[in-house]
């Protein structure tokens, strides 16, 4: 039995999100939450919420035992990039790119 949780449009680059996702892939959910709680990265807080949501989904929808759950798959994909403009000297302008990503978590026994 596998249960999913998805978070779309997170204001985080996919590259930075993947660094955090690699830390918890394949771990038990208890161990994964512990790693994410003490990680100083911005992506850790975001991914922790998605893992907690997947755990809640497994408990509520499937009646799963929380202690037996593991993070089966976790991956981060690129989302749309927000394009912004900032004024520069001599009437010029530069683009500012604000990347987003989608986080997918699957937990199971």
Curated annotation (Swiss-Prot):
Transmembrane segments: none annotated. It comes from the Bacteria. Keywords: Ribonucleoprotein, Ribosomal protein, RNA-binding, rRNA-binding. One of its GO terms (molecular function) is structural constituent of ribosome. One of its GO terms (cellular component) is cytosolic large ribosomal subunit. The keyword Ribonucleoprotein applies. CDD domains: Ribosomal_L22. The keyword Ribonucleoprotein applies. InterPro entries: Ribosomal_uL22, Ribosomal_uL22_bac/chlpt-type, Ribosomal_uL22_bac/org-type, Ribosomal_uL22_CS, Ribosomal_uL22_sf. PROSITE patterns: RIBOSOMAL_L22. GO terms for biological process: translation. NCBIfam families: rplV_bact. Belongs to the universal ribosomal protein uL22 family. Part of the 50S ribosomal subunit. This protein binds specifically to 23S rRNA; its binding is stimulated by other ribosomal proteins, e.g. L4, L17, and L20. It is important during the early stages of 50S assembly. It makes multiple contacts with different domains of the 23S rRNA in the assembled 50S subunit and ribosome. The globular domain of the protein is located near the polypeptide exit tunnel on the outside of the subunit, while an extended beta-hairpin is found that lines the wall of the exit tunnel in the center of the 70S ribosome. This is Large ribosomal subunit protein uL22. The gene is rplV.
């Amino acid at each position: 039995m596998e249960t999913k949780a998805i978070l779309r449009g997170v204001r985080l680059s996919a590259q930075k999100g993947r660094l955090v996702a690699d830390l918890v892939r394949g771990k038990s959910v208890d161990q994964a939450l512990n790693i994410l709680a003490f990680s100083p990265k911005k992506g850790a807080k975001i991914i922790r919420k998605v893992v907690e949501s997947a755990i809640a989904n497994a408990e509520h929808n499937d009646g799963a035992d929380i202690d037996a759950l593991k993070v089966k798959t976790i991956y981060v994909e690129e989302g749309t990039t927000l394009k912004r403009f900032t004024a520069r000297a001599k009437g010029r302008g530069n683009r500012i790119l604000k990347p987003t990503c989608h986080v997918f978590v699957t937990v199971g026994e």
